[in-house]
Structures are given as C-alpha cells and as structure tokens.
Amino acid sequence: MYTAFTSLNVFNDTRLNTYLDTIYSAIATAFGEEQLPIVCGSVAKVMQGVYSDNYLAKDIDLVIESWQIHRYLEQQLPLIFPADRVEVRPERVILFTSFIAIEFWRPTLLRPIAYYKNTVNYYVY
C-alpha cells in the first residue's frame, strides 16, 4: 500500500493525504509504481519552494502519462469513492470530493521531474 502522502504529512488535511494514498495505491497495484501520477501546478510549486508552505491550494493537479491509466481512473474512481462525483473530460478526469477537487491531466508539456522528500514526484517549474 502506498502511504507517502500520509507518512510525510504532505498536506495538513489528513483526508486529502488518505485520498491520494488510496489513488496512488490503486494505480501502483494495477500498473506499477513507475506509472504513478506526477504532481503539477501550484502544489508542485509549493513542493519546489516557489510558493510558501502556507499556500492554500484550490485543487490538486496531477499528470497521468498513460492513456490506459486515464481509462482506469474513469472506471475505478466512482467505485473507490462512491460518495464523490467524477467528471470525465477529453483532457482530464476530475474527482470532486466534499473538500477539494483532484484533477488528473493528460500530459501537455515535458518538464523535469523532482522528488518531494525523495518520495513524491512533481514537475519542476
């Protein structure tokens, strides 16, 4: 089971850490850890130190490089989180929780990748 978000307390909201660990675990189990999402957007900028640790994200942006994983998320997110809403768009899959939106984007740009606390991968801006 993937537990990096919870064990590192990446976010102050334990619910969010648990959601992300659950999603990453499902992907790692089905496709392997080399296929895990890459954190991007404002949260990646916080991880990189561009934004303050006090920055309050309005959503969590993740890049999924494989179209197969996009299809998997379209089908599995409603089963994993039945109380939440999932919206499928051509460029992304969005999980609307009661407290934040988690967006799974198709890749559009190639960026260098770094590792937050040597564990969670994110795009460098």
What is each PLM-predicted segment?
Residues L16-T18, V39-A44, F81-D84:
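A short linear-motif detector with a strong N-terminal bias
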Residues S66-F81:
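Amphipathic alpha-helical segments
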Residues Y24-I60, E65-H70:
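Active-site nucleotide-donor binding segment shared across nucleotidyl transfer reactions
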Residues M1-V39:
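Helical scaffold of the NTase/Pol beta-like nucleotidyltransferase catalytic core
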